[in-house]
Amino acid sequence: MWTNVFRIGGLHNVSWFQFLPSETELNPGFDRSSRAEQNEVATYLVLSSHLRLQKEGFLTTWTNSFVGPWDPSQGLYNPDEKIKLWLFLPGRHSSISDKAQAAVSKLRVVASGIWVAPGDSEEISVAFSQSLRNCIERALSGISYMRFGDVFSKFSPQSEEYLRRGQPTVEFIFAATEEAVFVHVIISAKNVRTLSSGDAERMLRSSLKNSSYRLPAFRKCLGLAKSEDNRLCYINTSHRPMLFPPVIVSPHGMRGSLTGFCPNDLVKQVYFSSGNLKTSTGYVGLPSHIGRGSRLINGNHCYVEVTLGCCQNRNDNTSQANSTFAVNLPHNQCPEPSVGSKDHRKGQSDLSSVCEKKFIYPAEAVLVPILQSAFAKFSLKRAGDFDCLGASENKSDGFYEKNGYNSSGSSRNSSISSTSSASSGSGWRMTSRTGDLDADADSLTCRQSGLTCNDDRLKMGSKRPRTGMAESFGQVGIENDQIGWDWDADDDDDDREVGMDIKALLSEFGDFGDFFENDALPFGEPPGTAESHVLVFPPDSADVGSSPVDMMDVSDQIVLPVGFSSFESFNPVPPIIDECLIKSQEVLHSSITSVPSNQMSISSTGEFDHLLKAEAMMTFAPEYGAVEAPMSEISSTFFKSPYLPKSHKVESSNSRTSNYVYGATPPTTDSDGAGDMILFGSKSCIGNNAGRTLYHSREHYTQVEGRKGRHDKLPTVISDNSSTKEGVSQSIHSKHSAANAVKVVQGKKTDGISAVVSTLLSSKTLLATDVGSVMFQAFMCRMRHIITSSKHSSPVSLTRLSGNFFLNQLSNEPSTLTDNISARNEIYKKDIPTRIAGDFDGGMLDSHMSAPVGVWRTVSVPKTAKPASSPNIEAGSSLPHSSFSEDSLLSYGQRQPLQDLLDGIALLVQQATSFVDLALDSDCGDGPYGWLALEELWRRELSCGPSAGHAGCGGTLASCHSLDIAGVKLVDPLSAEVFPSSVITLLQSDIKTALKSAFGQSDGPLSVTDWCKGRNQSGDGGSISEGFTAESALSEVNGVNISDDFIIDKYFGKQAVSNAIDGGKGDETAQSQDIYSSELLRPTLFVLPSPAILVGYQDDWLKISTNSLTHWEKAPFEPYALPKSINYAVVCPDIDPLTCAATDFFQQLGTGESTSLSFVKEVMLKHDRNWLGTHLPQSLGNQMEKDVGRLSSSGFVLLDCPQSMKIESNNTSLLGSLSDYFLSLSNGWNVNSYLKSLSKALKGLKLGSGLYTNQKEGSGSPCVVVYIVCPFPDPSAVLRTIVESSIALGSVIQSDRDRRSILNSQVARAFSSSTAVDEASISHIPVLSGFSVPKLVLQVVSVDSIFRITSPSFNELVILKDTAFSVYNKARRISRGMPNDAFFSSSLPSRSSSALTPMNSISGIWKDCGGSRMTGSTHPRDGEIDVSLRTSGWDTSTSWQIPRSGGLSCDPNRNGDFYLNDEIFYLFEPLFILSEPGSVERGVSPTFTSLGSESSKPIPEDGGRGSGPGMNSMEGITSGSSSQGDVSQLEGKAIPSLHCCYGWTEDWRWLVSIWTDARVLQQGCQILQACSSPDNGSFKPRDFVITRIGNFFELEYQEWQKAIYSAGGPEIKKWPIQLRRSAPSGIATNSNGSSLQQQDLSLIQERASSTSTLYSSHSKQSTFVKGSMGQSAGRKQIMGGQTISGTPRGLFQWVHSISFASISLDHSLHFVLPAELVSAGGGQSSTGMSSVNYIEGFTPVKSLGSTAFSYMMIPSPNMRFLHPSPLQLPTCLTAESPPLAHLLHSKGYAIPLSTGFVVSKAVPSMRKDSRINVKEEWPSVLSVSLIDYYGGYDNAHDKILQGIVKQGGGTKETRDFEVESHLILESIAAELHALSWMTVSPAYLDRRTALPFHCDMVLRLRRLLHFADKEVSRIPDKTGV
């Protein structure tokens, strides 16, 4: 078996040097340089040195980080931020080599040292990792690979427009052991392509059809009239840019917009031959000897122009609400949305920076993202929103004419589009100012999806105002990003049309009465305005993978005059405009773009009159002279009435034609410096500084003055209030404000470096060079660190925070179809990751399913009456607790957010801790929980840079954009399928060649065993012959089968073991010493069987495979616990099609009779068999019930809804019901109205006293299940339904009002506390329990399930089973707090005690059918549970508890004590449990073919892990030969370990923890309570495993360490294994718990010094574990506020070991197995692995995705990744981040001691059942990293290790560290992997997730809690938003 790992030698010791610029280089002789200029020069020095070193073959990189402490009080920017250079030299060096010295001559060394593999510094390791990637880049460029951030793709010119298969891409991440560095080569495929000739053709066609605004185009390349000198001619006819397709550019992988093309010869003539632009590095693109890019234009090679960058708006009062300034922005650039209320537009403008840049790239350096049609059909919730390349851009392709999203694009929702009404925009997000849009094509300039625009170009003059054009349809946070022209901005008393607008032009021109009358067009108004029509182009203009294109809706077909082919007929010889006028497009975002309308006084508009005139002259042919109206005519109505009937020609003194250049030959200049080169031969273009700020409006225009100056051939910038001199334009890339602008006094000169920097950062278009690209990337990286206030504009990705929360939140507004069902499509469209934005290739996404392709369709948008007070949806704050406007509030009266949250928290926990819930888990991970994960990921994309430019996150294509914090794969529209054959072929060819070239000493791709061994191998590790599987390699190393079971006698015989145990040493030779030494360092490689589950069967328990769940009703199986009686009520909207379908659904759920499918009738809950229990309707009548007839008696509670929705359904077919239902929803109901009715209905339910535990009845009383039918299918509506239902029901069942009030006050006090934590109140931190709910179950049923249209498509029986199983697991009946007599007097029968008799391995309460979990334990198993909690007659009672008490456990009066009577917990009664804990005991050492065969069997009794009494999992595992006695003699009945996973919510307000044990049997609190009894001598210590998702923070771990040493006192010294071996700073190992650090001692002076009552019979032992986790680093104490001096042993008398591990899903490993190893029947192949070699094209290969087994792999020596969180987005904190977040991140992540992997069967991916034929899934890989361990050995194990140490020499610390870590890690990993199989269900037979279920629940609960916290925290007052 091959891996994708390569080994690099010679890098185990590396010298590193860190550089910063020399101070002398930053002061070039005068002291007037600004700080910003120094920063830019410093950046240039560092980056140019880096590129030079890289070119010469050195390992080098640059990093941008904060030097010194972060001090937000210093303003928006950290003053100490610098760009640093790193140089790595293999070996030990005290100085830099002479070869490198020249490149760093202008830098100074600020730090240096030696990096010793695997490294112990996160910062150095990350920099080293990046330098290795840079080195590989050089090698790959020689074989035609281009770099796009962290992703590499091979350039291959394509003749086709798109590929059906994705483009292969390569990523590299790096790991290290003590001896070598390993490269993990991640092969994937992306839906991208290179540029094609069709792109140029479409751009040409688009420019011709819209010549009123033509693309900046080269006449030569577009085939237009050629100028005599072939100079570039920009036809810039308007300041309004056209919207261009997004592209991804090399080398940084940033997202940009394609804006032009140019042939090779022209670029060479201008750049390469002129010699004016010199660079010390090189140009972006493939090396010249390889060749250039595609032949895009007339069979010739071509360069392209790409616009990169963004803009930042940092003022909290510059909202784009209802404004139109966005229409004046340069290409694809929008101001960052100001997220807040509409009142924000009244503030002052204060743009912080402007950053846009145009680069000229070779075609091979540009990729175009595409979307395959099949994926679009699949992921309707995500795929329509093409702002994944930058959410704020939201621009459609200028030439990809798709738009007009009016339908769902889904077959099941096809009826939605047919009933479309009201607006054609994204109605639920638009700003409604003037009522509905007119039902014509012209009004459809908005984008219905929130993304696209039917015609986003300049509208030709129209005399009729278009109501609704002011509507804005951007994403949430960008709602008011104007699309199209605002022809009627007459509303809301605002004059936002500041700057260039069509009305300004028309004001200059006056009446259009005879403007267009000539021979070409004999009519009196511009084309397209007589009627409401818009041009629509054929479908070939789209670039979607061969799918239909959704076209513009028009009323009828229009036939244009012949002369209207383009505007060329108006002006046969159009003037050639010099490029200097294009500066108006290159200087970004002056106050024109974001100043609120009322900030632009009318008196100031005259200042721009000459500019308006110039704009007009640029727009129209010269024979039509400009006209100008006196100011008196346009003063107050300048932006109101675009037509002035008395206008007349006036030559303004400010508008002299001599000031503007129109000729083909531009004015000459005597400036020939590098800093003054203008694109394509144009001469210097003078920036108008005018002594104003960079953001002044006039700087959008360039004025050529007659006076020129020259000073030493370098341009200067003149700071003057009245005139502008020639000079270099001010840098637009500096992040400083106007006060920090570059101020170069005339007559002074700058040095060459400053000139180069000015050139690179000027506003001019430049050829893409290495240094220019990296300079721009570095600038964008710095920009992402801007600290933004919650009231300020947020980086674009953060605007998604409240994105879909706005769904249907227009209160008091009759909703239309768009408001409800089509809104789901908007959700589908919204949620494509931010990096793929723009409306590229997406016209087909929501095409009408029955619409013809490429034809005209009429616009018939019926108007829907809206109230005059229809509110505007404004953007809410993107930061916590102010995310919503008043219009998004649920109007349920005055809400109390905190009280609501506390009411609903128990039921929220119930929902999140369900193993599988189809309502939340459907859509292949794209359901509500997937939606929450995506939202969280987008909020983390601050690291991507401003406007999601993707400068600092690894590029647009990086895998980190589709992985959540746990490594779970999320929806990624760019992801494509990659096949094992492609992977191994690429690894064996290009990658192998490149790594050999880059590093010389490179072996690979390694076999599994070679990778696990991690040491030098004989021969060429990269040869084809090394492509064995792990089995063959294991058997061929010196003839020894190196399994990882450490069974010593397997290799050395029993005598050697005996010698080791006896301590014999006299007869051993040096050879045997080496053998022993190598034995300690062997890798782990095991084949593990898939875990089985335990269910009930008749009066016994049965061990079955997880696949058997599909046969539940046929077996018939029974639940592991007892049957449960269920009384249910269904709350359903009173919509006839829905109620009919729901009635049928719940009847089948209860009786198992299916009317639509011919499956078995007795399904699940059939009461006569009592398989799960009874399921009967119960009338919970309330005032809502009226005229419900049979529904009332059937347990239905109907919600009131608008009368217009109550349509009678006469359809009996499913399709008819669907059509009727969607038609009903289109009649005016929205989510807000539904939730209001739902809340009222739930609060009125007569639940009665039956919910509360009756001690006499015990568990015999039935549970009440409330089913909520959610009528809206979109994820946010389902989530909001859950939140509102939980709150409403929680308020009903809450009985203890006094306790509730106390809890509310405590939580409120905790939230309102100051930054400085009051240590005295630590003991009063509220801890909320998620399982104090009585016999009540909340189950939301989606409309998809009701209509049986789930995605993926489950059959009806599966849906019913999963729903029933989910309800069964949620139902809890037995109270842990009731008296024991009542507890055990249940009337329900238990399993027969005789059933336990034949299972001799079982004792006490354990239900098992197999052997012990881990044999060989020295501790007896009897009495694991406190005898007071069980009796001999109830052996099975307490085994139904699950430690899913989920971090939310609570006693408001907790002061170190826990009183059962204060809070009652209800025990978990599971449907099934694991038959045995995960363990390597039953693992198999792989042989030659076991990995490829399903016939592997456990190793025989005498030689394998599967037999013999091994060690307890946390104690280490002994060899098989050391325990030859009987199992019973060693009392090897192991006690399951306790597992805890915890994590913080995103806003760091809540800590969530979930407990379980290795078999999902016991509840952690229950066991800990039993531990606390001093009289319980039979209870044995347990192993504790503390798990963190992702990584432990170093400070976080140190706090754990302090707690352990403080609590354990001197007992800690007695634990023989402490892997880190050092006590925390300030903690003495002989401490009795009171000798803490001095600052900590002061915190507990006022606490009681008496013996803690924590260990009394009623104490809650979980206080320490849970309480300490919830405390911030460095300050928190333990044990509920009392000292533990009187109890020196503390908790640890019941703790055998404590382990800390981090967990995530790994995507860095590929495993490829020769397919011929497995015969058709699954048996072993006759060829054997040893004879199989890979031959490209002839050796069939497969992945491990379909394997029946799991594989555990732990490399040796201990391996760790150089980057602590590979494939994860970088974390960027802001001033809004809580102090705890800053504190924990300050020291980075804890470095793991060892990392292991468990490879198992593939979990259904996002693409499964998505109409994509996925031939083979890749396996799921669980990564487990050991952080630390405290514990001990058993005697046998200790003797063996001591014997080996004596034989091999050396100390125990140096010889057994790795074997200890391996033994511990493999046991932990096995248990964690087994816990993932608890998520199996009939719908997910291969598990729902590969994460352990308790870790997955932490993810779900923390996200749901965060969502609920924000949902209830909406503030009704606008000012609070």
From Swiss-Prot:
Tissue distribution is: Ubiquitous. Highest expression in the shoot apex.
Q: Determine the domain of life of the protein's source.
A: Eukaryota
Low complexity: which segments have biased composition? Answer: 407-427
Enumerate the UniProt keywords alphabetically. Answer: Developmental protein, Growth regulation, Isopeptide bond, Nucleus, Repressor, Transcription, Transcription regulation, Ubl conjugation
> Ranges of Polar residues compositional bias?
1486-1496, 1515-1527
Q: Does the keyword Transferase apply?
A: no
* Main location (coarse class): nucleus
Q: Where is this region: Disordered?
A: 400-434, 702-724, 1485-1528
**Result after altering residue 407 to N:** In gct-3; uncoupled cell division, pattern formation and morphogenesis during embryogenesis
Subcellular location field: Nucleus
Null allele phenotype:
Abnormal embryo and cotyledon development, and embryo lethality in most cases. When viable, plants are small with greatly delayed flowering time and sterile flowers.
What GO biological process term is on the record, naming one?
Answer: regulation of development, heterochronic
Find the cross-link Glycyl lysine isopeptide (Lys-Gly) (interchain with G-Cter in ubiquitin): 220, 226
What Gene Ontology terms describe where this protein resides (cellular component)? nucleus
Q: Which InterPro entries match?
A: Mediator_complx_sub13, Mediator_Med13_N, MID_MedPIWI
Function (record text): Component of the Mediator complex, a coactivator involved in the regulated transcription of nearly all RNA polymerase II-dependent genes. Mediator functions as a bridge to convey information from gene-specific regulatory proteins to the basal RNA polymerase II transcription machinery. The Mediator complex, having a compact conformation in its free form, is recruited to promoters by direct interactions with regulatory proteins and serves for the assembly of a functional preinitiation complex with RNA polymerase II and the general transcription factors. Acts closely together with MAB12.
Q: What family does the database annotate?
A: Belongs to the Mediator complex subunit 13 family.
Subunit description: Component of the Mediator complex. Interacts with CYCC1-2 (CDK8 homolog).
Protein name according to UniProt: Mediator of RNA polymerase II transcription subunit 13
State the organism of origin: Arabidopsis thaliana (Mouse-ear cress)
